[in-house]
Amino acid sequence: MCREDWSASIRRRPVRQAVTSDPRARRIRRALLARGSWSETNRVTEILRKETVGGIILLVAAAAALIWANSPWSQSYFALRDFELGGEWLGLHLNLTLGAWAADGLLAIFFLVVGLELKREFVAGDLRDPSRAALPIAAAVGGMVVPALIFVLVNLNTGDGALRGWAIPTATDIAFAVAVLAVISTHLPSALRTFLLTLAVVDDLLAITVIAVFYTDDIKAWALALAVVPLALFTVCAQRGVQKWWLLVPLSVATWVLVHESGVHATVAGVLLGFAVPVHRSATRRGQQVDHAERVGMAEYFEHRVRPISAGIAIPVFAFFAAGVSIGGLSGLSRALGDPITLGIVLGLVAGKPIGILVTTRVLSAVTRASLDSSLRWVDVLGMSMLAGIGFTVSLLIGDLAFGMGSERDEFVKIGVLSGSLLAASLAAIVLLTRNRAYRRIHREETADDDHDGVPDVYQTRQD
């Protein structure tokens, strides 16, 4: 390619990476957090729109739980949370409290969506491209390691099993995060929205791995082996495009029950079921046209139907039962905030997450000699890393697993997660609002459609 053609292509795509025939040079010059394709931007926007609604419902549910747990009627809240429902049938132990049903059962729906997202990202999303996947994966790992190290350092001499909570400040709650973005009304650029979502997806993968490996005690091999049967049948049905819920739901429930009985946390069943669903589907099968659900892929079909249940019911109900903590006034709050476990969680979320994500991103930039996209600044990455410090749903779940629901340390975990998440959200809002004028300008560029063809002009140079 001649110099004039090369320069012209750069002028046509002012915020894209430089084009060169040398693959090694292409990797070197690739911009970090570059704008994605129109189809990918549309998909991310739709997901975050649903998560925003779910995040607002989550905040309302958590606030209601806090108010009730600290009211004169607090005993009725804890009685409701600890009310046992279920029984033991065929040797299966399903006599759980309502709080446990929410944590083990409803969150499995959330992790089913996580599994679908992960499958979609690795097969058809940003994570399928190693050069684009490197940043969110590295950032997620950094955002997990540093908060965990901070928690361990703070609690190194605490003793009595305090270090079991090392993973609590490592999670990111995407629903809470996008609810914060909705409240502050910032016009976040598409590249940052995609980065936040992909980071959260990888973060969820790391979280479920941690839960399965570090918070599983005794395993019943027979139950785990039996769980393979309904999971395999579910996989066959999904691969064949079966959409009959009267068949899929019982298979899903059977998988969940057996995984729960095995000793592995039942939410792992949700991820496995999500992984079983195919992303792509041919437009024809045996020479015949298939319907829209199969044509777009069963993963998208499942996600469109399950995500509203996850965001609107499963996560808010879990938050309602998990966030209720009796603070005990200013003296109780002061005592809780002075506890090493609470302090380790707050520091991990507020300081550890931003440090881990930002430093990892800077190191990746230096190692690959890739500069940040020209429309963005490093303060934008700082704002995103602070927003990732909102660790609510999964952090509360890990706290329950580490110290036991209702224990004194579990109460400290809740105060630490709530305090750390609110502080991280406030700091992120301050940083992002300082850039809102630039975000509005980028938003105008990303939505301008002078030729009125339905695709913003800035995406016209990309092949979707």
From Swiss-Prot:
Main location: membrane
Tagged with keyword Zinc-finger: no
A GO BP annotation: regulation of pH
Entry keyword Membrane: yes
The reaction(s) this protein catalyses: Na(+)(in) + 2 H(+)(out) = Na(+)(out) + 2 H(+)(in)
Residue ranges of the TM segments: 53-73, 96-116, 134-154, 165-185, 195-215, 219-239, 257-277, 313-333, 340-360, 378-398, 412-432
GO cellular component annotations of the record: plasma membrane
Compartments, record wording: Cell membrane
Protein name: Na(+)/H(+) antiporter NhaA 2
Organism: Mycolicibacterium vanbaalenii (strain DSM 7251 / JCM 13017 / BCRC 16820 / KCTC 9966 / NRRL B-24157 / PYR-1) (Mycobacterium vanbaalenii)
